[in-house]
């Protein structure tokens, strides 16, 4: 029986292994050759299930940076998995995320098995947008938007909403509306956020902001009394 160890060089990203018989003390350790990064990723990492791949990010910062690249699938193309349908069930304020294979022929009578992935636990959400590129946008009761990965359970809070020239203590009625989408030109996930204030029937102020995920970029499109429309949609089609 042999025990295998692996490590990663932060300089060249090469993987090597070593084994030593546990029943033979003092025997020299045998080393395997270095594995090139492209061979390692294309033949090992890319074949792992998504949950196992998520655990690999804990090996080193270098592994994590490679796996989390926005263009990872373009640099190391792999066979796309079969499309799946995402189900979200809300119970007592908790969201449960399920998925099942998408049927090839929806007209046929066939039973599908849904797999439970994650739930939001004690975090209470009341609104959900998406999914877009494997992520959804959830809304908390305190109007904070959260980008959530239903497979890995990772989440990222959006910046707190604010309106220029308005003292927060003077807010009488504030609302916000989010829409989640993908920019195919810049290849970035973006959130369109509209915030506005009203007191009774009087319109006070509103802003249109675009948030880009993965950066600190927050671009204000319009503000103050810019009234374009009462509804909008941003997403893939």
From Swiss-Prot:
InterPro entries (UniProt xref): F-box-assoc_interact_dom, F-box-like_dom_sf, F-box_dom
Pfam families per the UniProt record, alphabetical = F-box (PF00646)
Q: Where is the F-box domain?
A: 41-72
Going by the entry's taxonomy, the superkingdom of the source organism is recorded as: Eukaryota
The identity of this protein, by name, is: Probable F-box protein At1g53815
Taxonomic lineage is: Eukaryota, Viridiplantae, Streptophyta, Embryophyta, Tracheophyta
């Amino acid at each position: 029986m042999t025990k295998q160890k692996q490590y990663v060089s932060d300089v060249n990203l090469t993987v090597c292994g070593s084994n030593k018989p546990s029943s033979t003390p003092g025997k020299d350790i045998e080393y395997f050759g270095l594995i090139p990064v492209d061979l390692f990723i294309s033949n090992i990492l890319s074949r792992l299930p998504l949950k196992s791949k998520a655990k690999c990010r804990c090996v080193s910062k270098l592994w994590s940076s490679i796996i989390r690249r926005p263009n990872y699938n373009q640099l190391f193309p792999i066979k796309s998995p079969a499309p799946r349908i995402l189900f979200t069930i809300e119970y007592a304020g908790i969201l449960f995320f399920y998925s099942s294979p998408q049927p090839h022929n929806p007209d046929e009578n066939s039973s599908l098995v849904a797999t439970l992935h994650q739930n939001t636990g004690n975090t209470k959400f009341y609104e959900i947008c998406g999914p877009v590129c494997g992520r959804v946008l959830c809304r908390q009761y305190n109007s904070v938007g959260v980008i959530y990965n239903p497979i890995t359970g990772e989440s990222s809070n959006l910046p707190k909403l604010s309106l220029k020239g308005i003292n927060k203590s003077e807010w009488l009625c504030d609302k916000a509306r989010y829409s989640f989408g993908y920019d195919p030109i810049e290849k970035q996930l973006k959130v369109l956020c509209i915030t506005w204030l009203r007191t009774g029937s009087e319109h006070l102020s509103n802003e249109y902001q675009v948030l880009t995920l993965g950066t600190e970029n927050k671009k204000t499109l319009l503000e103050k009394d810019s009234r374009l429309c009462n509804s909008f949609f941003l997403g893939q089609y």
